[in-house]
């Protein structure tokens, strides 16, 4: 129990406080609700009005026409005439009547400000309304030029900062749309007005005026042509803008920097026939260098940081000489070892290289010099963020150097590889990832594209080849044991290296392959998959022949032991071999596989079953390499003839190899016969392979065997026929037709031969196809369903040919085909429907308008097929319906009328038999979805009305189809048109019988959900009977629940994205000119946010700007003249506290002894450490003392309350055996309800009623433990009964008088 009268800990801080002596006051200090109530009774508001004196003055002067733009001149330009016309008459409208109906789209954003409570927004609205009214009163057309003239005149008249900011904001909007000739003509007067305001407002407290004036000035300068930049006055105005890039106020500085970037990158003459550099680039660069040198050595380096931020965007815009000067300046300021300055300088270099500028900006020599200089600024491997930035900058620098001059760039890469590989020793995983990614990108971007030019890479090579060898040696060093923690990253690098350079550099990589194989054999090697991937990359690029020369298989069939330490190479080669010599398989693997097969057979005869199985598996693995060797081989024309006989024998005599060899043949034909000579060579052996494959396919599958080999044989036949000579195909087709007609052929043989005919038909000539058609025509009406289906499959393959003999046959026999298909309609079996519909689909695609009757005759059959059992038949039926619709669209000139004619042919099905009605609705549903853009509104509405009538059917099939149609209609129809029929649909659904409503409850629920989303809950509820209301309420609850869940999920996703953005390194602004010229028109809407965010950023900046100096080792003094002294300036706090270490529960003293304290002492130490951590961040010692005292007082009060409520548990915990056995009791479910001072359980507020619960436990399935559980359950039941009886007796006693 807590102390009487004392509030719980933490509650007192939430209560309302009052000053001493005012505890009895009852009148509230805040009375905004009373003031709001008074304003309803026509009293004057007590607060400050938004109508200022300046606004009234501005309005009066605009109305009187006394304001003019500049001196009175003769009306030489259209702009001056418009200005005079605008300001002559008085307005007769109200004060703000020109705001809501302003016709110029430039100010569409301002019209949204009217409802804002911001005084700045209301001032903008007032100024725009006044200017618009004056322009209208003068008969103006409200063009951008008229607004520009009126606003410039207004700017000279207003005095208060609020009005001036409003005018400048509107000018900023309108200047972007004013024609360039106008701004060029009025540049002198306009720029003078802006410069005067900038001078007057430079030291004022308000930032709004300067922000918008600077933006206006940047837009004005951007519109000037190249000739105007030759005048000194233009550069003088630009320098005025440039001087504000070092302004102490961030919003002004940001506006100026944005303006400078937009001028240098986005001036109008920089797009077409642009000069090499902007005329103002030189003076800008000199200004940046001067400002950095002026303030570079100061302690805070604020101006330096501002200039570096500007250089980050502008460095790629400068000429080469100034880029060199800026780079030297950046390198000089980096020697100051100021952490933030170094980071910003790195960002500037990154933006320079990332922009990939031309030679006029960055030459290859200068790029190389910068790379060399940056090696003096390599951060410490323990300094995480600076090292990540340095690696990224160097990656971009080398990629850009290779782009400019590849041989020079390759010469610089070995040094970077050596440095980056050293980074793999860093304890930070982020550094490992960044270094690995940088090296991989360089290999892909810089090395791989030039390997063909480099040629063979050997250990004695020179030039670029020598550089590649050095780079590989640097990566290969990562396989030594000191890099064992980074072996995963090293293997990734080797994988990319093999892919990029393996073909040319394999002489220097052989030793590495041997090391990899030895490493894989080491016990408990954890990176087997990555190593296999690296060796696989070597196989792909070098070829298996080179890899096996470096690391032989060591398998020859004469082994004394069965270890086979390098047998793991066979699966690796299988998965990665391609584009290699097919002859190598013939000369190396084929003889070895035969030797191992013989060895396996000998061992099997000798009774050594296990050894025989091992050798048999090895030879089978060697055969599985064949498909890879057949993938784009380099010597098909030379090597295939030596392999063809072996493959034929393997197919016919080795069932275990049949699938593999067939796959190899298919791969060779599809991926290895691109050259005509290769194609001819493989085609030459078709007369040998096809008869073997035909005979195999004709053999029945033995009992217990899988049909996979048979399918593989048929697929191989199809593939081989694509390159077979037509005469051979015709002869094979003729023999197959004879076999089909042979009465002695069994059903299995006839079906198998028909499968072969299906494969042969598309490759035969027209005469052979005509003869085949005569052969299969009687089978289209066969009563044997399998034969009939195969006959239709033959016809389908012939009709599917888009060109060639098949297309010619269809064109010449079209009438005969139509007659045959219509005559065989009634005799078509269900299995034959799928190929028949497919055949009709291909024929309908080729029909013209005169064949309209044929399509009309097909419609009833196709509609009924939408309910076929076969999924394929249903799909083909729907596809054919859509194709018929497209045919009608081809036939007619008006698409809507043509589609209506097609639908009229389907409508009669709605009044036929039940099955026909259901199928017709399904067909109309599919057509509605497919042709929703072509159906007229009246057609869709008519369909919907008819389907609603069919909802009254007593057949579930019809109702199901009708509900499906309504669901599609709701999705497809426009809300405005659907709204007319909501009542009709709801009434039809409301009249459904109870049985229908119960059966289709899920469909109805989905339908109601769609209607509620479109028309609202109340309307749907009003239109439906009361028995549906409960469902509707549940739907509304489910929708609200889903909406809340989506909102929470979205918030979580956004939070994760924000965290990821915070974790990402800082990047420069967008590279595109569109981002630079994007409107920066957001006013002070987010000032409060920025202000609060600014405090956090300043706190973070103080932390980030801190630097730590790493001392020398031992008593050795730190040498500040050492060129690598910059590496000792760390942005990350050094020492053991930075790493994530294991907490053993005890503090350790400086000499390594454990410090064991009581818990209270530990809390005290934590408090002192927490206070100490805060001390380091406090600037004022007195402020620190106050904060610490307050903190200790608060902790003291909390501690006192906790000591009264909690009792410290003993430190000793039982364990071990004997008297030290575990004594903790198991937590029993429901134990928290047990009464402390009585028997039984008690109810607790906010918790469910007491319960007895036996948890499910898998161990209770044990027979012995099951009996124990039964006893436990019986005890619970008895206790419950006993408690019930006691309670019953007590209630009876209470009822007695």
Swiss-Prot record:
GO cellular component: cytosol; intracellular membrane-bounded organelle; nuclear membrane; nucleolus; plasma membrane
Official protein name in the record: RRP12-like protein
Organism from which the protein derives: Homo sapiens
Cross-link (Glycyl lysine isopeptide (Lys-Gly) (interchain with G-Cter in SUMO1)): 71
Record key words, sorted: Isopeptide bond, Membrane, Nucleus, Phosphoprotein, Transmembrane, Transmembrane helix, Ubl conjugation
Pfam families: RRP12_HEAT
Segments of skewed composition (Basic residues): 1188-1197, 1288-1297
UniProt key word Cytoplasm: no
């Amino acid at each position: 129990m807590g102390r009487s009268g004392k509030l719980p800990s933490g509650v007192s801080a939430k209560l309302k406080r009052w000053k001493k002596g005012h505890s009895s006051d009852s009148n509230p200090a805040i009375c905004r609700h009373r003031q709001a109530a008074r304003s309803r009774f026509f009293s004057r508001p007590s607060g400050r009005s938004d109508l200022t004196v300046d606004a009234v003055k501005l309005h009066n002067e605009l109305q009187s026409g006394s304001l003019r733009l500049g001196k009175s001149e003769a009306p030489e330009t259209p702009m001056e005439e418009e200005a005079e016309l605008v300001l002559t008459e008085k307005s007769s409208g109200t004060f703000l009547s020109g705001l809501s109906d302003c016709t110029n789209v430039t100010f569409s954003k301002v019209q949204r400000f009217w409802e804002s409570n911001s005084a700045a927004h209301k001032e903008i609205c007032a100024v725009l309304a006044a200017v618009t009214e004056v322009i209208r009163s003068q008969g103006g057309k409200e063009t951008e030029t008229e607004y520009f003239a009126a606003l410039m005149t207004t700017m000279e008249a207003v005095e208060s900062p609020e009005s001036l900011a409003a005018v400048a904001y509107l000018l900023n909007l309108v200047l972007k749309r004013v024609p360039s000739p106008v701004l060029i003509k009025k540049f002198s007067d306009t720029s003078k007005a802006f410069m005067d305001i900038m001078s007057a407002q430079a030291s004022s407290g308000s930032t709004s005026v300067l922000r918008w004036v600077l933006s206006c000035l940047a837009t004005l300068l951007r519109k000037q042509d190249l000739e105007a930049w030759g005048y000194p006055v233009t550069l003088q105005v630009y320098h005025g803008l440039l001087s504000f890039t070092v302004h102490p106020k961030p919003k002004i500085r940001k506006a100026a920097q944005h303006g400078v970037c937009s001028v240098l990158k986005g001036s109008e003459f920089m797009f077409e026939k642009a000069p090499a550099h902007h005329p103002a680039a030189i003076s800008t660069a000199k200004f940046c260098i001067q400002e950095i040198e002026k303030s570079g050595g100061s302690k805070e380096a604020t101006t330096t940081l501002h200039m570096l931020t500007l250089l980050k965007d502008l460095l790629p815009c400068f000429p080469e000489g100034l880029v060199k000067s800026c780079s030297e300046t950046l390198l000089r300021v980096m020697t100051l070892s100021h952490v933030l300055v170094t980071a910003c300088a790195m960002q500037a270099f990154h933006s320079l290289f990332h922009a990939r500028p031309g030679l006029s900006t960055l030459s290859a020599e200068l790029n190389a010099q910068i790379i060399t200089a940056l090696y003096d600024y390599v951060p410490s491997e323990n300094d995480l963020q600076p090292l990540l930035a340095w690696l990224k900058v160097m990656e971009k620098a080398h990629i850009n150097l290779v782009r400019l001059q590849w041989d020079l760039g390759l010469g610089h890469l070995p040094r970077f590889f050596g440095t980056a590989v050293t980074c793999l020793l860093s304890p930070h995983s982020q550094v490992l990832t960044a270094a690995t990614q940088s090296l991989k990108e360089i290999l892909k971007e810089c090395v791989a594209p030039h390997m063909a030019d480099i040629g063979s890479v050997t250990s004695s090579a020179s030039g670029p080849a020598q550089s590649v060898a050095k780079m590989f040696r640097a990566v290969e060093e990562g396989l030594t044991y000191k890099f064992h923690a980074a072996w995963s990253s090293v293997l990734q690098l080797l994988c990319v290296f093999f892919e990029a350079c393996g073909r040319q550099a394999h002489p220097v990589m052989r030793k590495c392959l041997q090391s990899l194989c030895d490493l894989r054999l080491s016990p408990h090697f954890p990176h087997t998959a990555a190593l296999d991937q690296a060796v696989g990359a070597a196989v792909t690029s070098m070829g298996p022949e080179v890899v096996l020369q470096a690391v032989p298989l060591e398998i020859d069939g004469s082994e004394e032991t069965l270890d086979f330490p390098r047998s793991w190479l066979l699966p690796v080669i299988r998965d990665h071999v391609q584009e290699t010599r097919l002859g190598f398989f013939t000369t190396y693997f084929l003889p070895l596989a035969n030797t191992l097969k013989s060895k396996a057979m000998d061992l099997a005869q000798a009774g050594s079953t296990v050894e025989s199985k091992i050798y048999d598996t090895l030879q089978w693995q060697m055969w599985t390499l064949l498909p890879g060797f057949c993938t784009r081989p380099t010597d098909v024309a030379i090597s295939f003839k030596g392999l063809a006989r072996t493959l034929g024998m393997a197919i016919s005599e080795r069932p275990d190899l049949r699938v593999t060899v067939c796959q190899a043949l298919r791969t060779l034909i599809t991926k290895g016969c691109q050259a005509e000579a290769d194609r001819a060579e493989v085609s030459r052996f078709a007369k040998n392979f096809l008869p073997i494959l035909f005979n195999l396919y004709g053999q029945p599958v033995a009992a217990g065997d899988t049909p996979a080999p048979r399918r593989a044989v048929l697929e191989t036949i199809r593939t081989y026929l694509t390159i077979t000579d037509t005469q051979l195909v015709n002869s094979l087709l003729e023999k197959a037709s004879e076999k089909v007609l042979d009465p002695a052929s069994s059903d299995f043989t006839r079906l198998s031969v028909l499968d072969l005919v299906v494969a042969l038909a598309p490759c035969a000539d027209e005469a052979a196809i005509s003869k085949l058609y005569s052969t299969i025509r009687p089978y289209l009406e066969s009563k044997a369903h399998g034969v009939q289906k195969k006959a239709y499959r033959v016809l389908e393959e012939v009709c599917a040919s888009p060109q060639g003999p098949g297309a010619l046959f269809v064109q010449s026999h079209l009438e005969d085909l139509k007659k045959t298909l219509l005559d065989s309609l009634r005799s078509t079996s269900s299995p034959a429907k799928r190929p028949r519909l497919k055949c009709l689909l291909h024929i309908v695609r080729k029909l013209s308008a005169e064949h309209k009757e044929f399509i009309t005759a097909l419609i009833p059959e196709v509609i009924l097929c939408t309910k076929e059992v076969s999924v394929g038949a249903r799909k083909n039926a729907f596809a054919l319906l859509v194709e018929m619709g497209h045919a009608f669209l081809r036939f007619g000139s008006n698409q809507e009328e043509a589609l209506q004619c097609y639908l009229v042919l389907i409508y009669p099905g709605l009044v036929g038999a039940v099955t026909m009605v259901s199928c017709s609705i399904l067909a109309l549903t599919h057509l509605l979805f497919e042709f929703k853009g072509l159906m007229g509104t009246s057609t869709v509405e008519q369909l919907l009305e008819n389907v609603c009538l069919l909802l009254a059917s007593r057949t579930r099939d019809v109702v199901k189809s009708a509900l499906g149609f309504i669901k599609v209609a709701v999705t497809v129809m426009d809300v405005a048109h659907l709204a007319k029929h909501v009542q009709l649909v709801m009434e039809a659904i409301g009249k459904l019988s109870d049985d229908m409503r119960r059966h289709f409850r899920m469909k109805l629920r989905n339908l109601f959900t769609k209607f509620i989303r479109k028309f609202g809950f109340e309307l749907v509820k009003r239109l439906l009977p009361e028995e549906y209301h409960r469902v509707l309420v549940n739907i509304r609850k489910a929708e609200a629940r889903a909406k809340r869940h989506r909102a929470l999920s979205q918030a979580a996703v956004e939070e994760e994205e924000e965290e990821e953005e915070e974790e990402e390194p800082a990047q420069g602004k967008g590279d595109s000119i569109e981002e630079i010229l994007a409107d920066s028109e957001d006013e002070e809407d987010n000032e409060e946010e920025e202000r609060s965010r600014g405090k956090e950023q300043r706190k973070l900046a103080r932390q980030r700007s801190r630097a730590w100096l790493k001392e020398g080792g031992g008593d050795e003094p730190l040498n500040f003249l050492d060129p690598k002294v910059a590496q000792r300036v760390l942005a990350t706090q050094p020492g053991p506290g930075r790493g994530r270490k294991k907490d053993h529960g005890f503090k350790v003293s400086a000499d390594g002894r454990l410090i064991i304290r009581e818990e209270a002492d530990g809390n005290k130490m934590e408090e002192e450490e927490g206070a100490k951590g805060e001390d380091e961040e406090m600037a004022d010692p007195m402020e620190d003392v106050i904060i610490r005292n307050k903190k200790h007082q608060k902790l003291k009060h909390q501690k006192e309350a906790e000591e009264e409520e909690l009792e410290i548990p003993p430190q000793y915990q039982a364990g071990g055996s004997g008297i030290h056995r575990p004594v903790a009791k198991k937590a029993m479910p429901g134990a928290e309800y047990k009464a402390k001072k009585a028997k039984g359980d008690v109810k607790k507020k906010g918790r469910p009623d007491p319960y007895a619960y036996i948890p499910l436990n898998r161990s209770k399935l044990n027979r012995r433990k099951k009996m124990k559980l039964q006893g436990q359950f019986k005890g619970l039941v008895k206790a419950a009964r006993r408690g019930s009886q006691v309670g019953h007796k007590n209630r009876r006693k209470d009822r007695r008088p």
